[in-house]
Amino acid sequence: MTIEFNATKREGQGSSASRRLRRAAQVPGIIYGAGKDAQPITLDHNELYHLLKKEAFHASVLSINVEGAKETVVLRDTQWHAYKQQVLHIDFQRVDASQKLHLKVPLHFVNGDNAPAVKLGGNIIAHVMTELDVQCLPSSLPEFIEVDLAALEAGQSIHVSQLKLPAGVEAVHHGEGDPVVASAQTTRGAAAAEGEGEAA
């Protein structure tokens, strides 16, 4: 389901205009890309704040209604106030249905409590990555990628190459190797008990 929300065209630009908007509970933003001119926009702070709390808002194709004109976009950047729960500025990139997107998608870890590493090995599972860089067409963009921990044994790890990615979705690697997504690690208590057992 596409997330839809409203925005208006922003006329005044610059820091003083942005401050006036924020005092009026509005957020300055911009829509750019797809070979078109950048469009400065204004959004309602309260609506945007609650949208940003949704995980799907960060990894979905979004639809912005700008005074009756629909823009299909993805979220690219959000600037927050240093200590207030206030959005200062937001950037959206237009989506071309025929062009692949490069975006971070959240990872959802399942069956961790049933993993042999936990049930039999007394391990804890460390989530080394919480999101994955992917590349795909907009129509193939998943809201999240599931990481099944059901078969994870004590001392083992799950790597990016072992993830079951949806059709048309590729993982984007930064650097060499096959990054670790999650690993089963011995707890201090279990390690101490094991050491005592060996000593006996």
Swiss-Prot record:
Question: InterPro entries given for it?
Answer: Rbsml_bL25/Gln-tRNA_synth_N, Ribosomal_bL25/Gln-tRNA_synth, Ribosomal_bL25_b-dom, Ribosomal_bL25_C, Ribosomal_bL25_long, Ribosomal_bL25_short, Ribosomal_L25_dom, Ribosomal_uL5_bac-type
Chain intervals for the UniProt region annotation (Disordered) = 1-20, 179-200
Sorted alphabetically, which Gene3D superfamilies does this protein's record hold?
Ribosomal protein L25, beta domain (2.170.120.20), Ribosomal Protein L25, Chain P (2.40.240.10)
* Coiled-coil portions: none
State the GO CC annotations: cytosolic large ribosomal subunit
Pfam families, sorted = Ribosomal_L25p, Ribosomal_TL5_C
Q: Which SUPFAM superfamilies match?
A: Ribosomal protein L25-like
Name the Gene Ontology molecular function terms of this record.
5S rRNA binding; structural constituent of ribosome
Which UniProt key words apply to this protein? Ribonucleoprotein, Ribosomal protein, RNA-binding, rRNA-binding
- Which protein family is it in? Belongs to the bacterial ribosomal protein bL25 family. CTC subfamily.
**Described purpose of this protein according to its UniProt entry:** This is one of the proteins that binds to the 5S RNA in the ribosome where it forms part of the central protuberance.
| UniProt xrefs under HAMAP family | Ribosomal_bL25, Ribosomal_bL25_CTC
Q: How does it assemble?
A: Part of the 50S ribosomal subunit; part of the 5S rRNA/L5/L18/L25 subcomplex. Contacts the 5S rRNA. Binds to the 5S rRNA independently of L5 and L18.
Q: What protein is this chain from?
A: Large ribosomal subunit protein bL25
The species this protein belongs to is: Azoarcus sp. (strain BH72)
Show the taxonomic lineage.
Answer: Bacteria, Pseudomonadati, Pseudomonadota, Betaproteobacteria, Rhodocyclales
